[in-house]
Amino acid sequence: MVISSLSNSQPLNAPVSSSPITQELANNLILTTLNDLYNWARLSSLWPLLYGTSCCFIEFACLIGSRFDFDRFGLVPRSSPRQADLIITAGTVTMKMAPSLVRLYEQMPDPKYVIAMGACTITGGMFSTDSYSTVRGVDKLIPVDVYLPGCPPKPEAIIDAVIKLRKKVAQEQTAERRGIEQIHRYFTLSHRLQPVSPILTGQYLQAETRQAPPRELATGLDTLVPRSLEANYIERF
């Protein structure tokens, strides 16, 4: 009887919608104070994962020195993704490295953040036009919170990116944290590449189609003849 009394233009509420009591409780004075304290503790102890694949990582390594001293921001470099909540992708990401990067990101505990450092990480950089193995943007693999352009960015720019990330962490709310979990931030698309056996096996010197150079050439250049070619020299000469 209640449904029939409603007009057709008036939408019905979903039966599984969140309770208004829970939404009001998230805006409670005590909980908001605890939320600010929780965000302050997290933004003061960001532990980055060392992930450098190219020349941009050299600029990031300059921050470890006493001149810039990024320890004052609470940044403690970690070598394990299970102990890090920030990953700074510094350098080019290739197709072969993409599954490993996604695996490292999935192993990081929530909440976690990503800083894309350098042109090669953001758009592919100078490899984006004629490279067959470069990923055109790391945001196709993992979600990015702060983009840091440059080739390479200066250490001062990296510090500015960390400060912007700290501001973002400080403004997060408890009710919004459900929407930034790992299952809601990106969708993993499995590639369609077919793994094949490697072409360069190291046995090309023993191939039947290889023509051995004459012994006079090796003797004149004072080079040692490989043992794998000695049999061919004996047969030919």
From Swiss-Prot:
UniProt-listed Enzyme Commission number(s): 7.1.1.-
Any one annotated GO CC term: chloroplast thylakoid membrane
Enzyme type, top EC level: translocase
Catalytic activity: a plastoquinone + NADH + (n+1) H(+)(in) = a plastoquinol + NAD(+) + n H(+)(out); a plastoquinone + NADPH + (n+1) H(+)(in) = a plastoquinol + NADP(+) + n H(+)(out)
Cofactor: [4Fe-4S] cluster
Cofactor note text: Binds 1 [4Fe-4S] cluster.
Gene Ontology BP terms: aerobic respiration; electron transport coupled proton transport; photosynthesis, light reaction
Assembly behavior: NDH is composed of at least 16 different subunits, 5 of which are encoded in the nucleus.
Family: Belongs to the complex I 20 kDa subunit family.
UniProt name for this protein: NAD(P)H-quinone oxidoreductase subunit K, chloroplastic
Phylogenetic placement of the source organism: Eukaryota, Viridiplantae, Chlorophyta, Nephroselmidophyceae, Nephroselmidales
Primary gene name: ndhK
